[in-house]
C-alpha cells in the first residue's frame, strides 16, 4: 500500500492492485459456516507468570478442523466490565511473545490476548496436528 504517495482521501478507498478472486464471497460463506459449526471448547488456565496488577492466563480454544489454539490472555485486576481489549497476532515464524511485552496494555486498562498463530512458533496446532 503506498502510504506516502497518495492523499488520505484516496487511501481510505484504496483496494490494492490484486484482483478480487471470483470465488471470494463463496469462500468466506463456507469459512464462516465452518467456524460457526465449531465448538470452541474454551479453557482459561491461570498462568505461572503473574503480576500484582494483572490476571494472567493461558487461553485455549478449538478452531476449525479441530486445531487447538493458544493465546496469552492478560486482564487488569480491577477492570470494569466491559472494558477495551487488544487482540495481537504475530508475523510468520514468530509466536505470541513474552508475557512482559503485554503488560503495558494491561497497565493502561486494556485486556490483551496474544495469539499463537497456528503452524508457527508457539503452542497452537495446525490442522495437520503439528504444534508450534
Feature roles, as predicted:
Residues 1, 17, 21-24:
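Secreted/periplasmic carbohydrate-active enzymes, especially glycoside hydrolases
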Residues 3-17:
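Short, contiguous pre-domain boundary segments
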Residues 28:
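Active-site-adjacent helical/loop segments in soluble small-molecule enzymes
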Residues 33-81:
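N-terminal cap/lid segment of alpha/beta-hydrolase-fold proteins
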Residues 64, 83, 88-94:
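Active-site glycine-rich loops that stabilize anionic/oxyanionic intermediates
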Residues 88, 100-101:
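Short, hydrophobic/aromatic alpha-helical segments in well-folded domains
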Residues 97, 103-132:
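Cap/lid segment of the alpha/beta-hydrolase catalytic domain
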